[in-house]
Amino acid sequence: MRKLLLAALICLSSPAWAATDVWLFYGWGPDGWSSGIDQIARRVRTLRGVNSVHVYDYRETQRAYNEAVAANHEHSLVFGGYSCGGNASLAVAGALAHNSRTAHVIALQPSIWCGRYPTTSNMRYFQDTWSSGTFGLGSYMPEGPPAGYTVFVERPNPHGAADTDPLYQRDAVFAVGAVADPSRRWILERHLMRTAPHVDRQDATVIWRRE
């Protein structure tokens, strides 16, 4: 188990000298309904190795895509979002496959109602924190060409409270931190093992965890 986790976290790694650019997307509705994304953004901006953090409406995928295409090719790219914003992250990261850009995606309760975007082979790491009891609002688990490594984390939180839940926020912040500064990836490893210790299934590229 520990060896598999270490292999997964190696997929998060980028050269220590490379900066990381981050795009975060709000969920459906007024931005204030996704206030947890602003909280995550504030924490992510303080992480070592993070170069820039952009926070957008989930519909601003073209803007995020254009900025990512123009970003320094030595930078790592991370896309994250809550609800429809998680789907937006998948959409932008997947589109970057046509530009031969790798990406990391961190989704918090992506929705089955906001577009069924697949994982793609240019995604070095995909992390999906989801909940089954949300009438589909926060239970989308994408399929597709496998990402470098995929982690599904089931946390049974109501959809409306997921973005502000401390564990959901730590899932996102620690994952960004592991990309931006590989020397700190052990923090994500420890967090997942402690807070989602039960493993339902796993193979070489995917693990399904739950609390």
Mark where each language-model region is.
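A short, hydrophobic beta-strand element of the alpha/beta-hydrolase
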Residues: 106-108, 128
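Lipolytic serine-hydrolase domain surface
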Residues: 22-30, 37-41, 117-210
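Gly/Ala-rich beta-loop-alpha elbow adjacent to hydrolase catalytic centers
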Residues: 81-85, 89
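Sec-dependent N-terminal signal peptides
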Residues: 3-12
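Sec/Tat signal peptide C-region and signal peptidase I cleavage site
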Residues: 14-18
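Short glycine-enriched nucleophile-adjacent loop
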Residues: 89-97
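Active-site catalytic motif of lipid deacylating hydrolases and related acyltransferases
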Residues: 19-75, 159
